[in-house]
Amino acid sequence: MKNLFIEENGAYSIDCKAAVWATDKIHEDYHNAGIHINDVDFLIENSTHILMVEYKNACLASAKNPEAFHPMEDKKISIITRKFYDSLHYLRLLDKTKPVWYIYILEYPNGDVTTRKRLRNRLKMELPFSLQENIGNGKRLIDRVDVLSIDEWNADSQC
């Protein structure tokens, strides 16, 4: 198993040496099967959970027009939400049944803890939290969603 994943810009890595299982091949696997979806960047299994990790960094020096990135736009929310739903199939095909946390690692100009919490709350409205409560007794699709900076991700011992 590859233990160190490099994000698409080559600027940061995610160390998964302590993971039970991890992959950054979800997009490649779907593409090879002729299926075009919106998927998360990384899937990481620890001892208790599956982490679906989406990464976006508009603060890189190579970012084109980072001020134009607005993560609270309806279209951006829709894409991030769809990545969660589209990636659930992959976990099912691999018979990964642990509870799921959806983690959005986000860096963008003027981003702060308050805006990330607002975004997290907005995502909660689009993800199946209320559906799980309304329907009830089956397996939960998601247990937690967080929007974190790189520093917050690095400091969170549960991730």
Model-derived segments and spans:
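Basic, amphipathic N-terminal segments that precede the first structured/catalytic domain
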Residues: 1-39, 47, 134-140, 156-159
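Short charge-dense sequence patches
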Residues: 28-42, 66-77
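Short, conserved, surface-exposed binding loops centered on an aromatic residue
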Residues: 34, 42-45, 93-96
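Acidic (Asp/Glu-rich) sequence patches and key acidic residues
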Residues: 38, 49-52, 64-65
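Conserved catalytic cores of phosphodiester-cleaving nucleases, focusing on short active-site segments
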Residues: 42-44, 49-59
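Catalytic cores of nucleic-acid endonucleases
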Residues: 58-109
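Short, low-complexity, polybasic intrinsically disordered segments
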Residues: 104-157
